[in-house]
Amino acid sequence: MRRHLSLLIGSLVLGLSLLIAPAASWAYPFWAQQNYDSPREATGKIVCANCHLAKKLTQAEVPQSVLPDTVFTASVKIPYEEGLLEIGADGSDVGLQVGAVVMLPDGFTLAPQDRWTEEMKEETEGVYFSQYSDDQPNILLVGPIPGDQHQEVVFPLLSPDPATDSNIHFGKYQLHVGGNRGRGQVYPTGEKSNNAVYTAPASGSVAAIEDGDNGSSILTINTADGAAVTETIPVGPQLLVNVGDNVEAGAALTNDPNVGGFGQVDAEIVLQNPVRIYGLLAFFAAVALAQIMLVLKKRQIEKVQAAEGNF
């Protein structure tokens, strides 16, 4: 029930935002929530890639190991050229928004805010974290947020404690991270956005280019068998063809306005047993002590040999 309520609220926020600020450049993680039970498919692909078709670099920084019940941070870097603009929903130039998803191992969660350090609070200022669903607290979402301020997103995380949860075990675990900058090329409904390349639906000659609603263009192609095929191109992409041009089916009718993209990366983290660390420290101490004793013994023998005149 809570998930449906959160999705309803998200939809209302989306609708209001489009009415109030139609030129904004969004990267909505909750669209994935509405269409997929998990953000990661069986193939390993994160579902954001189904709408954001361009591949871009995403980096993740996580500690090599953590102790139980410990607050730590994971950093997701979503780099792009500073000052870069893209096509908004109304065809205007807008700044890029970014979003991120972090799939943690079972038991790992967002750290309670009362355990955040002052540094964590500063690093996460202006960032809102949400769970993918009520029953998946280990899957965290961020975005959309302004990319010019957040090309690095820091997640304050809490490691589980096997002493209080029998389902958790010490060992190595995988994290799955996705980062997106800019708008998608395809909506979850399957329709193209105005941030995509539009292609010819059929081979033929461009017979007409007419103005449509909301700044769109309606392009008519006459095929060899006399049929007239139309393609509506929304405001934003620039036409590459003129009336009288011959085009092949699948040929680009517009430029590619997209400057963003999505990337994913896997990382590993070890939930370390503190007893093993103490044992390792004790082993190192024993080795160091043994080396010291050997050195002292050697010096003692050398002194005895020197006293006996046996060099």
From Swiss-Prot:
Pfam families: Apocytochr_F_C (PF01333), Apocytochr_F_N (PF16639)
Cofactor note: Binds 1 heme group covalently.
Membrane topology: Single-pass membrane protein
Subcellular location: Cellular thylakoid membrane
GO biological process: photosynthesis
Signal peptide from the UniProt entry: 1-27
One cellular component term from this protein's GO annotations in UniProt: plasma membrane-derived thylakoid membrane
Residues binding heme: Y28, C48, C51, H52
Subunit structure as annotated in this protein's UniProt entry: The 4 large subunits of the cytochrome b6-f complex are cytochrome b6, subunit IV (17 kDa polypeptide, PetD), cytochrome f and the Rieske protein, while the 4 small subunits are PetG, PetL, PetM and PetN. The complex functions as a dimer.
Matching HAMAP family: Cytb6_f_cytF
Family: Belongs to the cytochrome f family.
Protein name as annotated: Cytochrome f
